[in-house]
């Protein structure tokens, strides 16, 4: 890993020296490409414009170093991440086209005007295989958590924007754990609004969706749940001044479970539909502490509101007519 870090720093230094005063514009273009606001071809074109012909290789070396560092570069076709290197033997672009025009003029009149298919000049559609730049998609596109390599690459770009030279492994690990815990808090807030749960130590929520629910019309029900005694976690170690916590006796635990079952309701809660955007919207409105930053909270609330949808009366009527037509074809009758 130290070799990759040294190679990345050396490639960044060489690229900065080659860019000179255009280094800020290059970092801005790199950020836009990483956010998928510009394509790889546009980024290469801008880099080719900022660099001289002799320094184009520094751009390629830097991209190779940063992709190797993030372990994103797995198998790319030859030349996919490089700019075209023409060197000193570049041919003049106007000669071949000029020859074609002269030869076409010398053709006979009968061969000049021939019916031509307009689609023949269109670019042939080729299905793009999921490789190369597909690994750079945002997690909002893939619907999956960002990988460690993607987070490290994003942090490297952000560090370069703020004048930092490198990102440590400890910082990447901290961001990975922070993302996981943040999503767990959001899921906990959503599930706690839909299902009953128990609380340990006054704040730790557990046993979501338990079938044993308290009966609010029984006085003993509240007492039973408030006086619930459970064993400590298996990994808890006693302190120096504390005695080790003892596990509850099996007979006492069995009596306690029977008492809770007797004090619970006689009907099970109805099954709920899958979690939708309305559940997420309500959970974020009730638990504002899940997203403490007001800017991020307001932006996500706007996105959720834009995706809220429910059928209106016309759509429901059209759906009913459609179902009746399908039933008529099958020889059935819908009421």
Swiss-Prot record:
Which keywords belong to this entry?
Nucleus, Transcription, Transcription regulation
- MF terms per GO, please? transcription coactivator activity
Mention any Pfam family matching this sequence.
SAGA-Tad1
Compartments reported by the entry: Nucleus
Q: Name the Gene Ontology biological process terms.
A: positive regulation of DNA-templated transcription; regulation of DNA repair; regulation of RNA splicing
Against InterPro entries, the record matches this protein to:
Hfi1/Tada1 (IPR024738)
Function of this protein? Answer: Probably involved in transcriptional regulation.
Tell me, how does this one assemble? Component of the STAGA transcription coactivator-HAT complex, at least composed of SUPT3H, GCN5L2, TAF5L, TAF6L, SUPT7L, TADA3L, TAD1L, TAF10, TAF12, TRRAP and TAF9.
Q: Which family does it belong to?
A: Belongs to the TADA1 family.
Q: What is this protein called?
A: Transcriptional adapter 1
């Amino acid at each position: 890993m130290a070799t990759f870090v040294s190679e990345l720093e050396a490639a960044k230094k060489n690229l900065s020296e080659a860019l000179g005063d255009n280094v800020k514009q290059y970092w801005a273009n790199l950020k836009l490409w990483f956010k998928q606001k510009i394509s790889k071809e546009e980024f290469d074109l801008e880099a080719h414009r900022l660099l001289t012909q002799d320094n184009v290789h520094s751009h390629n070396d830097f991209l190779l170093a940063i992709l190797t560092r993030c372990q994103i570069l797995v198998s790319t076709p030859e030349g996919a991440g490089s700019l075209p290197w023409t060197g000193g033997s570049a041919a003049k672009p106007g000669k071949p086209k000029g020859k074609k025009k002269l030869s076409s003029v010398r053709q006979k009149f009968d061969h000049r005007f021939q019916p031509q298919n307009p689609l023949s000049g269109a670019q042939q559609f080729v299905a793009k295989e999921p490789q190369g730049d597909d690994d750079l998609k945002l997690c909002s596109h893939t619907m999956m958590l960002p990988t460690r390599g993607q987070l490290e690459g994003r942090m490297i770009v952000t560090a370069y924007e703020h004048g930092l030279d490198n990102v440590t492994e400890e910082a990447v690990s901290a961001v990975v754990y922070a993302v996981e815990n943040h999503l767990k808090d959001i899921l906990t807030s959503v599930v706690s609004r839909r299902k009953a749960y128990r609380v340990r130590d006054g704040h730790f929520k557990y046993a979501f969706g338990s079938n044993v629910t308290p009966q609010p019309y029984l006085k003993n029900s509240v007492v039973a749940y408030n006086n619930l005694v459970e064993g400590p976690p298996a990994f808890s170690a006693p302190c120096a001044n504390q005695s080790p916590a003892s596990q509850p006796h099996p007979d006492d635990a069995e009596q306690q479970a029977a008492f809770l079952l007797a004090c619970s309701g006689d009907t099970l809660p109805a099954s709920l539909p899958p979690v939708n955007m309305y559940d997420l919207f309500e959970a974020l409105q009730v638990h504002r502490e899940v997203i403490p930053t007001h800017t991020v909270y307001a932006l996500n609330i706007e996105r959720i509101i834009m995706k809220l949808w429910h059928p209106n009366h016309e759509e429901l009527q059209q759906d009913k007519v459609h179902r009746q037509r399908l039933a008529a074809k099958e020889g059935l009758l819908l009421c």
